[in-house]
Amino acid sequence: MSQSTATYINVIGAGLAGSEAAYQIAKRGIPVKLYEMRGVKATPQHKTTNFAELVCSNSFRGDSLTNAVGLLKEEMRRLDSIIMRNGEANRVPAGGAMAVDREGYAKSVTAELENHPLIEVIRDEITEIPNDAITVIATGPLTSDALSEKIHAVNGGDGFYFYDAAAPIIDKSTIDMSKVYLKSRYDKGEAAYLNCPMTKEEFMAFHEALTTAEEAPLNAFEKEKYFEGCMPIEVMAKRGIKTMLYGPMKPVGLEYPDDYTGPRDGEFKTPYAVVQLRQDNAAGSLYNIVGFQTHLKWGEQKRVFQMIPGLENAEFVRYGVMHRNSYMDSPNLLTETFQSRSNPNLFFAGQMTGVEGYVESAASGLVAGINAARLFKREEALIFPQTTAIGSLPHYVTHADSKHFQPMNVNFGIIKELEGPRIRDKKERYEAIASRALADLDTCLALL
């Protein structure tokens, strides 16, 4: 198939991946037609028409270079990521993590793209895959039915799917502050989380209520398949009575403060279990329940989650919801630049490619956008080295075993191992991997 001769590039979808791709293309001097159907047609989960809206958590996760997603974020900053830049400008306290005011952040991304002289924003639903120009499809897991059919046809089948869910958000003014305390785990960074401690008796009662609560029904013909990083709390609870104690209710590093006067188990310094609340907006008026993605019916959410100490009278401004995520058979369909193997003028980006997470989705848009621009200019594709986070992620999703392929977060396990003797200390090993990654990335920057 010959390369398109159009004078612009299409980007379909203005989520995290599409917004990043559009920006990366436009900053290279190429006109972009950015299509977004919200404003004309709503999705079940989005609440606004803003670009790059965060529909689940407001956290971009860990910020340390000894954390793989922290390394990926630093690489993206060096590549001038619009998502990272606007995220930094709209940060809210989150200890050692990076969390944002979701509304302020999305509004700032939207304004920057709408005001870019080379980006034409078109609010319309796309139901056919364009063949008039190089095109980046970044319509995400909530792709409209009409376009999904066309994508599935291009991909030669139905692809794959899994379910993920969003956590509830509550009004801070309705929290009983006498029963909670402010602290970050291991006192990392500033104290940024409200912690709701539970005694063993409270936890056992909560676990019983959670595992017997009524869930909202799925379509009868679909099995329940979840991505481990966004598993509903009730599904986790049913795996075992202590499963949550090693997950979102882990008490380690969250000792009672000296001035805590609420219920506790004897003289123990650490609660039996802890539910953490994270600030959700810059004003600090909204908090989400960390790790409590759920598919319970709304009435059940209110009943069960008000058993959490401090939340007995909490007002829920948004209940948890669950949605179906579709993703492609990327190992068979895409190259490391997220380019279609069967149609070189077609790129895909975002969760539909099998990357999982906000940061990972934006990173895939960055890679696809850079390479769509390079194809437009008839330049050689840029494949980031596997020693970097931003190179290892596309390599993994396009080289995994297709039969067992599932969405993947960035992690040190997919980054190329260090040469020489293995560094036994994990922190030192991750620091060495990060140092090598950033040095190798700087070499790539010279090519851009």
UniProtKB/Swiss-Prot annotation:
The highest taxon in the source lineage is Bacteria
Q: Which UniProt keywords apply?
A: Cytoplasm, FAD, Flavoprotein, Methyltransferase, NAD, NADP, Transferase, tRNA processing
The top EC class, named as a word, is transferase
The Swiss-Prot or TrEMBL record lists the needed cofactor(s) as: FAD
Q: Is the keyword Transmembrane assigned to this protein? A: no
Homology family: Belongs to the MnmG family. TrmFO subfamily.
Mind telling me what this protein is named?
Methylenetetrahydrofolate--tRNA-(uracil-5-)-methyltransferase TrmFO
Species name: Streptococcus pyogenes serotype M18 (strain MGAS8232)
